[in-house]
Each structure stands twice: as C-alpha cells, then as structure tokens.
C-alpha cells in the first residue's frame, strides 16, 4: 500500500495510539469528579492545554477542546453570530471563495449577512478586494464588528494565505479574524500572536491523531457564545472532556516539535513528485511560491477523468483523491477549482496527491510508475 491521501486523514502514529490506550485502560476517571481517580486525567488536560498553547504562542486558557475542525469552525461562526445578536449588533461575515464546506454550509444555514471575497488563479486572496468589502460593510453598518474567516492553507490546492496582511486589514476595521488551520497545523510554523489571529480551528486527525478531537483557540478578550452548553471548559464548551483523545493530541503535538526537518524533507519529495507528474502531462495548481509542502493538485490534459484514474490506482494499492474527502461523493466540480477559474472539464480531470510525513522517495517513484502505466491503459481503452 502506498498512501498519498494524507490531506483526507493521516494515519494515527503508534506512540499516539499507545498514549490513547493508556488513558482508556488506566486513567479513565471523569476529570470533573472530585475523586482521586480523576486527578490524573484533570491534570493531564491542563498539561495538554499548556503544551498546545506553547506550540502556537498562546495562553493555556485560550485553548478549548472540541470534536474536530468542523465543530471548531461552526462554533467560531455561530458563537460570533449569537454574541453579536445578543448585544444588539448586526453580525456580518466575510469568507473567501475557497473555504472548507463546513464554513460554507454554516454561512448558508445561519441567520447572518455574509459575503465572499475572491481569489486569483493561484488561490490567493485579493487583499484589495477584501479590504473593499470590509470597508463598505463597516460604512454601511455603523458599529459593525465583522468576522473574517479564512483558511490558512487550502485543503485541495495547498495554497497558503498571507494571514499577517489579512489580519492587519481586519483589525484596521475593528474586525475579528478566524483562521481555519486544519490543513496547515503541523505542516508549517504557526504563532497566533505573530500572525494576529483571533480564533483558530485545528483538527487532530490531520497530524497523527485519531478522528474526533480538535481545538478552537480563542484569543483572550474575544467574545463568542458557546455552541454546546455545560459546565466544562469554563462553561464555553460543555460535555465531559474526551480525556484519551486529548492525551493523544498532546502526544502528537510533542512529536511535531521534534520533527524540525519536515519542510526540507517534504519539499524534496514534493519536487520529485511534481517532476514526474509533469512528465506525464499534468499541470500543477495552486501558488508555486506559497504552498504547503505536502499537497499537490494536478490536472491531466488528456481525455481521462480523475475518478477513473483514482479507481485504477486504488486497484494497484495506491491511494490518491480528486479533492476534499468531505465532498468526494459530489457530482459537481470542486468549488475551489471553479474559484481559481478552472473550467468543468479540467476540474473533473484534477487529482490531489498529499504526502504523509513518512513517505519515501522509493514509494513516490513506484506510485508514479504505476500512474504512468494506468494512464496508458486508460488511453488505450479509448483508442
């Protein structure tokens, strides 16, 4: 098996699984209980907060554990809307045209005004257009405190946004910046203070944790309402804490600290993969200068649909995708590819390769050899 779909989900790391099982088997107390069996789980949660906060340049009390990226995204948006409504302000949200489906679905199903700001053909946000939208709504809605929600790195094409500049624009108009860092976390350095991030969503299963754990960073002073009510986590996120999964995420973050050569290693592998893809007639999508090192979006300019190539590769034990896993069953072309001005035909011919941290050069070469063979087979069937 050669797994090249890491952006969909990463394989849980052995040491992370061991940590999870340890807390399932031996330290299973309820952290909210006054009994002695609960002391260790409660203490571990505090240590996990401190470890994560230190990794992103935050304070421990600014970290709130959730079930994952989608919950964190929805909480940031709905919590903002509910709080603004409660204090008699008009909630207004600006997002880019290439956001994750959890953001788009949230905007389209909640009672709030929102607008989309465009991206260029590389998937980079037009900063002038963004400022124009924020300026216009701030002028029209007096006292408006807009929420701008932006992916740090896109999950389909890997483009990384200039969050520092976006933050400067947002704060110039007294807005709040929420960043979806689900794909970026663990793949690039993130310091929320340096970047000027007010809220940030993260999901554990993108960096070696099991599915079902994540967190929302909320900068001290940012006011949003809870999404799930209860007494836990200072009343901000109810529900008994998922102790084993929090322990697993703490372990995964500690491992990220140790992998100091990730960028160098992954860029070498990425460049080799891209060279092989270009030899087969693919063009590469996304920003050539500002991108994650592990995501490659590639369009084949031959009469082969991505779904057919994905199926053929699957039968060979090589796993790739056509884009976001959360939208893999859609019959419509990717909204991300449409946003970067790709036509429907090319969108249906686009694949995504995302490299796990432990992939080898030999595995990439083997996968590319198999892909070349499968493309030739598919073309011969059409002849």
Segment roles from a protein language model:
Residues 1-383:
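Pyridoxal 5′-phosphate
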């Amino acid at each position: 098996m050669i797994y090249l779909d890491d952006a969909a989900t990463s394989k849980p790391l052995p040491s992370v699984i061991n940590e999870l099982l340890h807390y399932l088997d031996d330290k299973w107390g309820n952290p909210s209980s006054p009994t002695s069996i609960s002391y260790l789980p409660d203490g571990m949660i505090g240590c996990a907060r401190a470890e994560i906060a230190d990794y992103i340049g935050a304070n421990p009390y600014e970290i709130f554990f959730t079930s994952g990226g989608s919950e964190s995204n929805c909480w940031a948006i709905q919590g903002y809307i509910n709080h603004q409504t409660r204090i008699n302000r008009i909630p207004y949200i600006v997002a880019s045209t290439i956001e994750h489906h959890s953001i788009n679905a949230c905007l389209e199903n909640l009672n709030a005004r929102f607008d989309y700001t465009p991206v260029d053909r590389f998937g980079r946000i037009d900063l002038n257009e963004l400022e124009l939208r924020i300026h216009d709504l701030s002028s029209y809605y007096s006292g408006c405190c807009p929420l701008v929600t932006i992916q740090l790195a896109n999950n389909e094409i890997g483009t990384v946004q200039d969050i520092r500049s976006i933050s400067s624009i947002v704060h110039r108009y007294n807005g709040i910046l929420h960043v979806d860092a689900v794909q970026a976390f663990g793949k690039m350095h993130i310091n929320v203070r340096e970047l000027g991030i007010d809220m940030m969503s993260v999901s554990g299963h993108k960096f070696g944790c099991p599915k079902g754990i994540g967190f929302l960073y909320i900068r001290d002073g940012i006011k949003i309402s809870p999404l799930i009510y209860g007494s836990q986590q200072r009343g901000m996120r109810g529900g008994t804490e998922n102790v084993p999964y929090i322990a697993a995420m703490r372990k995964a973050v500690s491992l990220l600290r140790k992998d100091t050569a990730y960028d160098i290693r992954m860029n070498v592998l990425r460049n080799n993969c891209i060279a092989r893809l270009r030899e087969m007639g693919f063009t590469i999508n996304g920003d050539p200068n500002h991108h994650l090192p592990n995501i490659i979006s590639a369009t084949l300019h031959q009469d082969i649909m991505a779904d057919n190539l994905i199926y053929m590769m699957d039968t060979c034990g090589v796993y790739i995708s056509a884009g976001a896993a959360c939208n893999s069953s859609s019959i419509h072309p990717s909204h991300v590819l449409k946003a970067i001005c790709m036509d429907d035909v090319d969108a249906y011919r686009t694949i995504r390769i995302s490299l796990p941290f432990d992939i080898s050069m030999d595995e990439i070469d083997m996968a590319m050899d198999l892909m070349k063979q499968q493309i030739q087979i598919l073309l011969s069937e059409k002849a």
